[in-house]
Amino acid sequence: MPSSKQIIGLMLSVILLESPIALAQDQSPAYARIVPADLKWSPLPSMPKGAQIAVLHGSPAKPGLFTIYVKLPANFKLPVHSHPDERVRTIISGTYYSAIGDKVDSSKLMAFPPGTFSHVPPKVWQFAETRDEQVVFQITGIGPTDIDYLNAADDPRKPQ
């Protein structure tokens, strides 16, 4: 049976080890919580009409970690594009269809149902679409980021 000195020592160790962690969690000025009702959606001009963005953390236009939600309407087509940075994507709702390649080929599209996680390497040509439902996905990466279209005519930011 442990002595009372050992028990007190163990309790003191636990208190001393846990206190800085609890203190750090309680005092973190960067702690953020966003519930769906608080999302602020706005048009995403770098993607075809109908795409929307909600910034959850950081800024995709500035250096540092960012997390965004992207909302795409049903029957949305995203032309061949790439990103200069590495990113991770998680599908929140709806089924997203995506493929790697520098030419749209519907037979290559893979379904990404809700909950699907994917790692997207930098500078990889890809294309995507939604079908009969709206899709929301989360992107986390290190900014600044951008989207580059293989065919300049597909870039909605450029005058037609």
Which residue ranges define each predicted feature?
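Short beta-strand His + acidic residue motifs that chelate non-heme Fe in jelly-roll/DSBH
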Residues: 78-80, 98-99, 120, 125-131
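Glycine- and acidic-residue-biased ligand/ion/polar-headgroup-sensing regions
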Residues: 73-76, 82-103
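Short acidic-glycine-tyrosine-enriched beta hairpin
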Residues: 96, 102-123
